[in-house]
């Protein structure tokens, strides 16, 4: 086996190969032999994915990439060769369904039937039933997976499907389960789990229903994949942007700060590997395991575990003090090659990609979980029969589980013991806080009884509020149990809802409920017996206005009754019908033979102020188009719209100046006359177009296209008198008869004069003006009105309407009608929807037709209907006859609602002013009578459920309310209980009548979000964007002792925290929030008082305010930030871990560092900062130290948490920020502030087109800094990343910094010796490693200071003189 000869090695491998499952061992041996000189050890072990992974990792670590690649290639060839030889393949016969499946399904069905029964008896709510069903199927599914594994393992270990899934080659148990177990539960598109599971698998085949349900999940998977890919890409972009300028720029920042990595269950896993220790690590025996700055490899990590170390302090990017970068030692190993990271490595980009990339994987894992799984808690069963004892420490409170089981929850940690009845050793169980107990203290229990469900630590699960409707299964009357205590709640909009305050039942007592039609009134009183067919209620339909009845033929389900309210016949007009080629035209002819053309046709409907007919009148018709002018005196009525013309209010004269307008739109080559030429009538102006009048022609053209030709008729007179020409320039003027127009030009008639320039010369055009006289009133025969004392009235009025407004030019060749005389309908006191019908009637005297206008009231009368589940049968009777005259308010028809089955009528309690909309008949089938065999234990009005006892040994097998007890006979009205939980919204009130299918209540409950990456990616985004969640948990602001009191209303609670200095802070907690603390508990700042998602900003504030009282500002800020950072890192890790994605902590730390690096200035003190400005914490620290030395006031600040988008936009580089988002805003602000970009990150340099300061470009960056530092290289010793870029430093180490006037004049020597500096440092307690001496202030003389201000601070002078740094002068 270990022979070095290749031939023997090959043959020996071949002889082993035929042992099926051991085929892959040879892989390890061959591959390993190629790499090592010594013969490898023989390992008899099945090689699966995990072993292969470790093997490749080992080879890579010890032998490099080339050898590993060759080995992997050999392994691949080997695998394929033996797979071919063994003929591994998959066929349908390989899919073997375990026999245990049917039994498991049977057990699940039994459990669910029992749950349904509990629900029917009103012991659990609809939500609890749903949860229980889903959990039952989830558990069954898990058990079936185990059965599948067991079946393959025992009966067919070499099954191809099993080998494939088990070795990690392809597929996983979740997929194998669907092939041979059961497909399981599916979710609908809203993400709710459907409680009908898919019981079959793909081997057996799905039923149609199951196929349709399972296609939900498939669709969801596809859509999710598409959406999440985009989301994940955008997340990566934001991460890259926030961290792109984090580059390793220093060897060692020299920090003493560190983070503690604690062991989980005594194991560190990979969490320490690649880190450097921040201090000497010693074990319990004081033995040094590692010095400071020792890189931790897997062996050292194991050594720590073996020494039972609970935690190790390591260096981390979170605590690195390198300005805006990370040093090599804080970052640790670069995970690509497990060596210390190189200088110039762009670790920010690596971190961003490491976090963003798994986002796409997360997406693919849609929902493998069956919803709410209870796997996080362990169930403890009794191992013996005996008596339960809680012990003296125990404190428990009542609790209802999500499955509706009444249990007790532990409020403290305690030990529970079961003392055996037969004597012997008791069973001890540790009960941690929050665990559920299903037994009582002192209870005797049997062996294998569920005692408790142990809580696995306080996991903050993400929950969401959800609602579920409770739908009524039978018609009947609603009765509340008094325990519900409903109360009315008014929301912000003023809507009132009824809410249950306690857990209790709503009962629906059976009966036949009748929905009454609108305006129906009961004709029977309550508690009266009725027979089948008896009238229960009556609805009547009455006429509103009265009039003559017309009965129409019935249409569909109803019959129309028309009542003629008002009618009017136009007796003065004959109605004539004329046939034309376009159809029938109707005319009205008056006695003076004037004709009106009818605008409507008989049989149609018209409304108020609509035109009935128009006068056919040629008196106001023109021959051509032209210009219209109103003479003074003619007035029109003001109207909203001029759609129907302008109504004349006072008659007068209308002036008309004819003008012929031809609209052409042809090429100019077709023009046959000249512009402004005089033409005669009949002249061809354009090909095939002739002028109808004589006059001067005006041609309008554009881009060689003829638009219009206008002919202005009249007489043309040449005129040289410029005064006259100027007078009639433009639109011209109207001149009356007999007036002199110009020298030698006079007119006999009214004309319009205009100056015109023609080819012959300038002159005046005298255009004739036609006058139309309009009377004040339209000339019409007598019109009459029909007035009624009550109800609508009718009338006809005449109106004259002008079609055009004053000064309007009508472009036309044909004539137009200037005035229309119209007959209009006028109605009074009508409702808007009331219309007038136009009818034709015969005049008996003159044998002609007349026009009749009729106002109708239409009433739809219901036809008889047969009964259905919610309505009784109805019978409708008409109370009128055709042509009968009825008065207003007379009944036209009555509808009777008839009883379906005999029984006793009950009317609901009348609510103020509301009519009765439903009534109920209690039938014989709604009650049962029970013969009691002994003394009755029940009372009248008591409600009972299945299994309750009538007498000592006799139980009931129905639910309902006891109506009557007569001796031994007990009458029970059947009913159905529905459990409602506290805070449910009640849709019905006590005593209401409901139909089957009505909603009774809306249950409000909290459910866990499905443990699924669909929650994962948004959750990561929520964390990294530092979003403020809705309904966040209430956090404790200061440390202290808890005191819980009742609030003002019954169910609210006030939690008071009593601090050490006896200050009390109160936190009112609303109904529906779970309090997470108990009385007398000690809490620290930032601890949860209620459940819910945490608001990270609030958490940071809590940490900071608490620490601010105990520590200096800088320390408080750093410690608060550190606490928050630790929490953020673990939250992000939890999401990825739950999906099985491994990301190294340091990547998340780099991003979190960027999110928490800034502080908000509250008070600038004597620094140059502005209040509200966001500044790097390190920069504030340096400035404050410098200011405090010069005696100025340091700035006050609060730490802030920025989401990744905000952090990217708040970066110092405006080029980077502008290329990310909100380009215009960022650039504008940068321009206004006169910012400089120091091109530190990668993005800025790429955009500018320079070499990036990372990788090989890093050395160039360092050289540039050295050149800049010039004569003061020691500046770089203190600031190796060159962050100050010596931008505002003068060669003599000074910066102008405003400070207090006194401090301004304190003399500081320019270049003190190193010893002098050292002495001053020790005197003022300055740490040279953290202080930036380049930022020390230099004195500046200020002429504006008073003599007093110019005086130096005596104390400061004395100090400097003592040090010998200042001469006596």
UniProtKB/Swiss-Prot annotation:
Enzyme Commission code(s) on record: 2.7.7.6
SUPFAM superfamilies: beta and beta-prime subunits of DNA dependent RNA-polymerase
Cofactor(s) listed: Zn(2+)
Catalytic activity as recorded in UniProt: RNA(n) + a ribonucleoside 5'-triphosphate = RNA(n+1) + diphosphate
Broadest EC class assigned to this enzyme: transferase
Acidic residues bias: start-end ranges: 1342-1351
Comp. bias (Basic residues): 7-24
Gene Ontology molecular function terms on file: DNA binding; DNA-directed RNA polymerase activity; zinc ion binding
Pfam families recorded: RNA_pol_Rpb1_3 (PF04983), RNA_pol_Rpb1_4 (PF05000), RNA_pol_Rpb1_5 (PF04998)
GO biological process: DNA-templated transcription
Keywords linked to the UniProt accession: DNA-directed RNA polymerase, Metal-binding, Nucleotidyltransferase, Transcription, Transferase, Zinc
Gene Ontology terms: cellular component: DNA-directed RNA polymerase complex
Residue ranges, compositional bias (Low complexity): 1357-1369
Residue numbers binding Zn(2+): 253, 320, 327, 330
Coiled coil: none
Free-text comment on the cofactor: Binds 1 Zn(2+) ion per subunit.
Region of interest: Disordered: 1-26, 1294-1369
HAMAP family with a match to the protein in the record: RNApol_bact_RpoC2
Annotated function: DNA-dependent RNA polymerase catalyzes the transcription of DNA into RNA using the four ribonucleoside triphosphates as substrates.
Assembly: In cyanobacteria the RNAP catalytic core is composed of 2 alpha, 1 beta, 1 beta', 1 gamma and 1 omega subunit. When a sigma factor is associated with the core the holoenzyme is formed, which can initiate transcription.
Entry similarity comment: Belongs to the RNA polymerase beta' chain family. RpoC2 subfamily.
This protein's name: DNA-directed RNA polymerase subunit beta'
Organism, scientific name: Prochlorococcus marinus (strain NATL2A)
Gene: rpoC2
């Amino acid at each position: 086996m270990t022979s070095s000869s290749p031939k023997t090695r090959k043959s020996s491998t071949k002889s082993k190969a035929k042992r099926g499952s051991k085929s892959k061992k040879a892989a390890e041996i061959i591959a390993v032999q190629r790499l090592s000189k010594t013969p490898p050890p023989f390992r008899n072990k099945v090689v699966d994915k995990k072993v292969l992974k470790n093997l490749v990792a080992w080879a890579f670590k010890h032998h490099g990439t080339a050898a590993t690649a060759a080995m992997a290639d050999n392994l691949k060839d080997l695998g394929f060769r033996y797979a071919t030889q063994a003929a591994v393949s998959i066929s349908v016969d390989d899919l073997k369904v375990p026999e245990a499946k049917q039994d498991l399904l049977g057990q699940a069905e039994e459990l669910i039937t029992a749950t349904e029964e509990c629900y029917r008896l009103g012991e659990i709510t609809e939500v609890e039933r749903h949860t229980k069903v889903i959990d039952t199927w989830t558990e069954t599914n898990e058990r079936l997976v185990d059965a599948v594994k067991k079946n393959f393992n025992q009966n067919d270990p070499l099954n191809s499907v099993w080998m494939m899934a088990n070795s990690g080659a392809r597929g996983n148990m979740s997929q194998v389960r669907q092939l041979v177990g059961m497909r399981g539960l599916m979710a609908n598109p809203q993400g709710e789990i459907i409680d009908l599971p898919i019981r079959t698998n793909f081997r057996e085949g799905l039923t149609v229903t199951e196929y349709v349900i399972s296609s939900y999940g498939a669709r969801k998977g596809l859509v999710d994949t598409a959406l999440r890919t985009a989301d994940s890409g955008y997340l990566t972009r934001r991460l890259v942007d926030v961290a792109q300028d984090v580059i390793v720029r220093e060897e060692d920042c020299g920090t003493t700060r560190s983070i503690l990595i604690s062991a989980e269950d005594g194991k560190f896993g990979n969490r320490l590997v690649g880190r450097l220790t921040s201090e000497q690590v010693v074990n319990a025996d004081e033995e040094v395991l590692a010095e400071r700055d020792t890189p931790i490899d897997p062996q050292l990590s194991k050594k720590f575990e073996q020494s039972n170390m609970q935690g190790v302090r390591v260096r981390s990017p979170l605590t690195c003090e390198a300005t805006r970068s990370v040093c090599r030692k804080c970052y640790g190993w670069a995970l690509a090659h497990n060596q210390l990271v190189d200088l110039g490595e762009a670790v920010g980009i690596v971190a961003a990609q490491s976090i963003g990339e798994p986002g796409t994987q997360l997406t693919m894992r849609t929902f493998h979980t069956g919803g709410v799984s209870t796997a996080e808690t362990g169930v403890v069963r009794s191992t013996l029969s005996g008596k339960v004892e809680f012990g003296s420490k125990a404190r428990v409170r009542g609790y209802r589980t999500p499955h509706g089981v009444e249990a007790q929850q532990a409020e403290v940690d305690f030990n529970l013991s079961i003392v055996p009845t037969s004597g012997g050793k008791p069973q001890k169980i540790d009960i941690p806080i929050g665990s559920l107990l299903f037994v009582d203290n002192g209870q005797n229990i049997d062996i294998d009884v569920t005692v408790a469900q142990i809580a696995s630590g306080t996991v903050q699960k993400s929950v969401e509020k959800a609602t579920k409707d409770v739908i009524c299964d039978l018609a009947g009357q609603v009765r509340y149990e008094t325990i519900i205590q409903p109360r009315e709640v008014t929301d912000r909009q003023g809507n009132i809802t009824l809410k249950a305050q306690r857990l209790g039942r709503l009962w629906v007592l059976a009966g036949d409920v009748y929905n009454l039609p609108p305006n129906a009134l009961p004709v029977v009183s309550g508690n009266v017996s009725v027979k089948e067919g008896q009238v229960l209620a009556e609805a009547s339909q009455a006429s509103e206005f009265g009039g003559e009845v017309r009965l129409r033929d019935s249409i569909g389900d109803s019959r129309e009754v028309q009542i003629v309210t008002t009618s009017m016949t136009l007796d003065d007009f004959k109605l004539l019908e004329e046939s034309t080629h376009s159809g029938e035209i109707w005319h009205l002819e008056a006695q003076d033979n004037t004709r009106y053309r009818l605008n409507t046709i008989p049989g149609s409907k018209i409304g108020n102020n609509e035109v009935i007919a128009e006068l056919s009148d040629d008196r106001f018709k023109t021959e051509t188009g032209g210009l219209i002018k109103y003479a003074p005196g003619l007035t029109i009525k003001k109207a909203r719209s001029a759609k129907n013309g302008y109504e004349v209010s006072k008659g007068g004269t209308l002036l008309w100046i004819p003008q012929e307008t031809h609209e052409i739109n042809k090429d100019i080559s077709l023009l046959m006359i000249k512009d402004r030429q005089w033409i005669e009538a009949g002249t061809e102006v354009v090909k095939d177009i002739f002028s109808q009048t004589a006059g001067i022609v005006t041609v309008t053209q554009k881009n060689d296209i003829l638009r219009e030709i206008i002919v202005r008729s009249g007489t043309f007179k040449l005129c040289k008198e410029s005064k006259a020409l100027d007078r009639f320039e433009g639109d011209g003027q109207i001149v009356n008869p007999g007036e002199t127009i110009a020298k030698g030009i006079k007119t006999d008639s009214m004309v319009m004069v205009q100056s015109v320039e023609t080819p012959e010369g300038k002159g005046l055009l005298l255009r004739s003006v036609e006058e139309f006289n309009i009377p004040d009133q339209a000339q019409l025969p007598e019109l009459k009105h029909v007035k009624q004392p009550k109800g609508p009235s009718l009338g006809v009025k005449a109106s004259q309407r002008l079609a055009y407004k004053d000064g309007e030019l009508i472009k036309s060749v044909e004539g137009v009608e200037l005035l229309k005389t119209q007959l209009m309908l006028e109605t009074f006191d009508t409702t808007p929807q009331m219309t007038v019908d136009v009818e034709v009637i015969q005049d008996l005297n003159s044998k002609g037709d007349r026009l009749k206008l009729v106002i109708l009231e239409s009433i739809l009368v219901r036809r008889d209907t047969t009964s259905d589940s919610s309505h009784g049968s109805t019978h409708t009777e008409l109370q009128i006859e055709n042509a009968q005259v009825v008065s207003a308010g007379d009944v036209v028809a009555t509808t009777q609602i008839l009883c379906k089955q005999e029984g006793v009528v009950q009317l609901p309690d009348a609510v103020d002013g509301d009519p009765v909309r439903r009534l109920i008949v209690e039938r014989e089938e709604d009650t049962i009578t029970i013969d009691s065999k002994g003394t009755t234990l029940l009372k009248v009005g008591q409600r009972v459920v299945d299994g309750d006892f009538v007498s000592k040994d006799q139980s009931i097998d129905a639910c309902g309310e006891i109506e009557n007890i007569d001796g031994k006979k007990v009458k029970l009205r059947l009913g159905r209980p529905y459990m409602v939980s506290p805070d449910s919204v009640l849709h019905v009130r006590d005593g209401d009548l409901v139909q089957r299918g009505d909603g009774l209540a809306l249950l409000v409950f909290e459910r866990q979000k499905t443990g699924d990456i669909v929650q994962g990616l948004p959750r990561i985004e929520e964390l990294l964007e530092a979003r403020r969640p809705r309904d966040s948990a209430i956090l404790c602001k200061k440390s202290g002792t808890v005191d819980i009191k009742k609030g003002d209303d019954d169910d609210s609670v006030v939690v008071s925290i009593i601090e050490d200095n006896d200050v009390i802070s109160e936190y009112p907690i609303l109904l529906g929030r779970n309090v997470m603390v108990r009385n007398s508990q000690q809490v620290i700042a930032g601890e949860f008082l209620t459940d819910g998602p945490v608001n990270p900003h609030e958490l940071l504030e809590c940490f900071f305010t608490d620490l601010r009282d105990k520590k200096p500002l800088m320390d408080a800020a750093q410690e608060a930030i550190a606490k928050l950072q630790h929490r953020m890192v673990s939250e992000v890790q939890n999401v990825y871990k739950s999906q099985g994605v491994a990301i190294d902590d340091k990547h998340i730390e780099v991003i979190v560092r960027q999110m928490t690096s800034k502080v908000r200035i509250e008070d600038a003190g004597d620094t140059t900062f502005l209040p509200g400005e966001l500044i790097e914490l390190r920069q504030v620290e340096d400035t404050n130290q410098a200011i405090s030395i010069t005696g100025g006031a340091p700035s006050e600040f609060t730490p802030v948490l920025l989401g990744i988008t905000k952090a990217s936009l708040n970066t110092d580089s405006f080029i980077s920020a502008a290329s990310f988002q909100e380009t215009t805003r960022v650039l504008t602000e940068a321009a206004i502030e006169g910012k400089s970009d120091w091109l530190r990150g990668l993005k800025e340099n790429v955009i500018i087109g320079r070499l990036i300061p990372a990788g090989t470009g890093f050395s160039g960056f360092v050289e540039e800094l050295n050149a800049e530092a010039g004569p003061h290289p020691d500046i770089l010793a203190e600031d190796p990343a060159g962050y100050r870029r010596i931008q505002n430093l003068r060669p003599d180490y000074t910066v102008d910094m405003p400070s207090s006037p006194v401090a301004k004049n304190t003399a500081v020597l320019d270049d003190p010796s190193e010893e002098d500096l050292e002495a001053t440092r020790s005197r003022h307690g300055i740490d040279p490693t953290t202080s930036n001496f380049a930022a020390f202030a230099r004195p500046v003389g200020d002429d504006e200071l008073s003599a007093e201000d110019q005086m130096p601070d005596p104390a400061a002078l004395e100090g400097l003189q003592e040090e010998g740094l200042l001469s006596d002068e």
